[in-house]
Protein backbone atom coordinates (compact mmCIF):
# COMPACT_ATOMS: atom_id res chain seq x y z
CA UNK A 1 0.00 0.00 0.00
CA UNK A 2 1.38 3.43 -0.90
CA UNK A 3 0.31 6.76 0.52
CA UNK A 4 1.30 10.34 0.02
CA UNK A 5 4.04 11.28 2.58
CA UNK A 6 2.39 14.67 3.24
CA UNK A 7 -1.17 14.00 4.41
CA UNK A 8 -3.80 16.46 3.22
CA UNK A 9 -7.53 16.75 3.68
CA UNK A 10 -8.33 14.76 0.55
CA UNK A 11 -5.84 11.98 1.19
CA UNK A 12 -6.59 9.02 -1.01
CA UNK A 13 -6.03 5.53 0.28
CA UNK A 14 -4.32 3.83 -2.63
CA UNK A 15 -3.93 0.14 -3.11
CA UNK A 16 -0.99 -1.59 -4.67
CA UNK A 17 -1.27 -2.01 -8.39
CA UNK A 18 -2.16 -5.71 -8.29
CA UNK A 19 -5.33 -5.36 -6.20
CA UNK A 20 -8.86 -4.50 -7.33
CA UNK A 21 -9.91 -2.48 -4.26
CA UNK A 22 -11.33 1.00 -5.00
CA UNK A 23 -9.69 4.22 -3.80
CA UNK A 24 -11.47 5.84 -0.80
CA UNK A 25 -11.31 9.55 0.02
CA UNK A 26 -11.54 10.80 3.61
CA UNK A 27 -15.11 11.98 3.02
CA UNK A 28 -16.15 8.62 1.64
CA UNK A 29 -14.42 6.77 4.46
CA UNK A 30 -16.19 8.85 7.13
CA UNK A 31 -19.62 8.95 5.51
CA UNK A 32 -20.05 5.28 4.62
CA UNK A 33 -21.93 2.95 6.91
CA UNK A 34 -20.20 0.14 8.78
CA UNK A 35 -21.79 -2.39 6.41
CA UNK A 36 -20.40 -0.53 3.36
CA UNK A 37 -17.00 -0.24 5.01
CA UNK A 38 -16.90 -3.96 5.71
CA UNK A 39 -17.74 -4.67 2.06
CA UNK A 40 -14.82 -2.46 0.98
CA UNK A 41 -12.51 -4.14 3.47
CA UNK A 42 -13.14 -7.65 2.10
CA UNK A 43 -10.07 -9.01 0.41
CA UNK A 44 -7.67 -6.56 2.08
CA UNK A 45 -4.87 -7.70 4.36
CA UNK A 46 -5.32 -7.49 8.11
CA UNK A 47 -2.80 -4.65 8.26
CA UNK A 48 -4.70 -2.64 5.63
CA UNK A 49 -8.01 -3.25 7.41
CA UNK A 50 -6.53 -2.03 10.71
CA UNK A 51 -5.00 1.02 9.00
CA UNK A 52 -8.28 1.97 7.27
CA UNK A 53 -10.34 1.48 10.43
CA UNK A 54 -7.86 3.56 12.43
CA UNK A 55 -7.96 6.28 9.78
CA UNK A 56 -11.78 6.25 9.84
CA UNK A 57 -11.80 6.49 13.66
CA UNK A 58 -9.31 9.39 13.58
CA UNK A 59 -11.37 11.25 10.97
CA UNK A 60 -14.62 10.70 12.86
CA UNK A 61 -13.03 11.90 16.12
CA UNK A 62 -11.75 14.98 14.31
CA UNK A 63 -15.29 15.67 13.10
CA UNK A 64 -16.74 15.20 16.59
CA UNK A 65 -14.12 17.56 18.04
CA UNK A 66 -14.91 20.23 15.44
CA UNK A 67 -18.62 19.85 16.13
CA UNK A 68 -17.99 20.18 19.86
CA UNK A 69 -15.90 23.33 19.33
CA UNK A 70 -18.66 24.91 17.26
CA UNK A 71 -21.26 24.01 19.88
CA UNK A 72 -19.07 25.40 22.68
CA UNK A 73 -18.51 28.69 20.82
CA UNK A 74 -22.23 28.98 20.08
CA UNK A 75 -23.12 28.36 23.72
CA UNK A 76 -20.50 30.88 24.86
CA UNK A 77 -21.92 33.54 22.52
CA UNK A 78 -25.47 32.83 23.76
CA UNK A 79 -24.37 33.05 27.41
CA UNK A 80 -22.53 36.31 26.71
CA UNK A 81 -25.69 37.73 25.06
CA UNK A 82 -27.77 36.68 28.07
CA UNK A 83 -25.18 38.18 30.46
CA UNK A 84 -25.32 41.55 28.67
CA UNK A 85 -29.13 41.45 28.65
CA UNK A 86 -29.27 40.66 32.38
CA UNK A 87 -26.68 43.35 33.16
CA UNK A 88 -28.83 45.92 31.36
CA UNK A 89 -31.88 44.74 33.32
CA UNK A 90 -29.96 45.03 36.61
CA UNK A 91 -28.90 48.59 35.72
CA UNK A 92 -32.49 49.50 34.80
CA UNK A 93 -33.81 48.06 38.08
CA UNK A 94 -31.11 49.93 40.02
CA UNK A 95 -32.24 53.21 38.39
CA UNK A 96 -35.88 52.43 39.21
CA UNK A 97 -34.90 51.56 42.79
CA UNK A 98 -33.02 54.83 43.18
CA UNK A 99 -35.96 56.78 41.77
CA UNK A 100 -38.38 55.04 44.13
CA UNK A 101 -36.11 55.75 47.11
CA UNK A 102 -36.18 59.46 46.23
CA UNK A 103 -39.96 59.34 45.90
CA UNK A 104 -40.24 57.50 49.23
CA UNK A 105 -38.03 60.08 50.96
CA UNK A 106 -40.20 62.90 49.56
CA UNK A 107 -43.39 61.18 50.73
CA UNK A 108 -41.85 60.53 54.15
CA UNK A 109 -40.97 64.23 54.48
CA UNK A 110 -44.53 65.24 53.55
CA UNK A 111 -45.94 62.73 56.03
CA UNK A 112 -43.74 64.02 58.85
CA UNK A 113 -44.68 67.62 58.02
CA UNK A 114 -48.37 66.69 58.08
CA UNK A 115 -47.94 64.93 61.43
CA UNK A 116 -46.22 67.98 62.86
CA UNK A 117 -48.97 70.21 61.54
CA UNK A 118 -51.68 67.89 62.93
CA UNK A 119 -50.05 67.96 66.39
CA UNK A 120 -49.94 71.75 66.42
CA UNK A 121 -53.60 71.97 65.35
CA UNK A 122 -54.63 69.42 68.00
CA UNK A 123 -53.01 71.49 70.78
CA UNK A 124 -55.39 74.33 70.17
CA UNK A 125 -55.18 77.81 68.76
CA UNK A 126 -51.69 79.12 68.52
CA UNK A 127 -50.28 82.40 67.56
CA UNK A 128 -48.86 82.04 64.11
CA UNK A 129 -45.13 82.20 63.96
CA UNK A 130 -43.08 82.54 60.89
CA UNK A 131 -41.86 78.92 61.06
CA UNK A 132 -45.35 77.45 61.50
CA UNK A 133 -46.73 79.53 58.64
CA UNK A 134 -43.90 78.48 56.38
CA UNK A 135 -44.49 74.83 57.24
CA UNK A 136 -48.21 75.07 56.46
CA UNK A 137 -47.61 76.85 53.18
CA UNK A 138 -45.03 74.27 52.15
CA UNK A 139 -47.42 71.46 52.96
CA UNK A 140 -50.26 73.02 51.01
CA UNK A 141 -48.10 73.76 47.97
CA UNK A 142 -46.56 70.30 47.88
CA UNK A 143 -49.99 68.68 48.23
CA UNK A 144 -51.29 70.71 45.26
CA UNK A 145 -48.31 69.80 43.08
CA UNK A 146 -48.15 66.11 43.86
CA UNK A 147 -51.86 65.31 43.69
CA UNK A 148 -54.18 65.94 40.80
CA UNK A 149 -56.99 64.16 42.64
CA UNK A 150 -59.41 65.86 45.00
CA UNK A 151 -57.51 67.41 47.94
CA UNK A 152 -58.56 66.83 51.54
CA UNK A 153 -62.12 67.98 52.03
CA UNK A 154 -64.00 68.84 55.16
CA UNK A 155 -67.25 67.29 53.97
CA UNK A 156 -67.22 63.55 54.41
From Swiss-Prot:
Record flagged with keyword Nucleotide-binding: no
Localization of this protein: Nucleus
Keyword Repressor attached: yes
CC per GO annotation: nucleus
Entries under Pfam families matching the protein: bZIP_Maf (PF03131)
Coiled-coil segments: none
Domain of life: Eukaryota
GO molecular function, one term: sequence-specific DNA binding
SUPFAM superfamilies, A to Z: A DNA-binding domain in eukaryotic transcription factors (SSF47454), Leucine zipper domain (SSF57959)
GO biological process, one term: regulation of transcription by RNA polymerase II
Region (Disordered): 1-21
bZIP domain ranges (all copies): 51-114
Ranges where the record places region Basic motif: 51-76
Keyword annotations from UniProtKB, A to Z: DNA-binding, Nucleus, Repressor, Transcription, Transcription regulation
Annotated spans, Leucine-zipper: 79-93
PROSITE patterns linked: BZIP
PANTHER family per record: TRANSCRIPTION FACTOR MAF, TRANSCRIPTION FACTOR MAFK
Subunit description: Homodimer or heterodimer.
Function: Since they lack a putative transactivation domain, the small Mafs behave as transcriptional repressors when they dimerize among themselves. However, they act as transcriptional activators by dimerizing with other (usually larger) basic-zipper proteins and recruiting them to specific DNA-binding sites. Small Maf proteins heterodimerize with Fos and may act as competitive repressors of the NF-E2 transcription factor.
Similarity comment: Belongs to the bZIP family. Maf subfamily.
Protein name per UniProt: Transcription factor MafK
Taxonomic lineage of the native organism: Eukaryota, Metazoa, Chordata, Craniata, Vertebrata
Amino acid sequence: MTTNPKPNKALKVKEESGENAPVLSDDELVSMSVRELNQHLRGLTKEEVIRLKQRRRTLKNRGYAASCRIKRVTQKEELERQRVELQQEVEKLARENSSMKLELDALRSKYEALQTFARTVARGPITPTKVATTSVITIVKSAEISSSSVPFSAAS
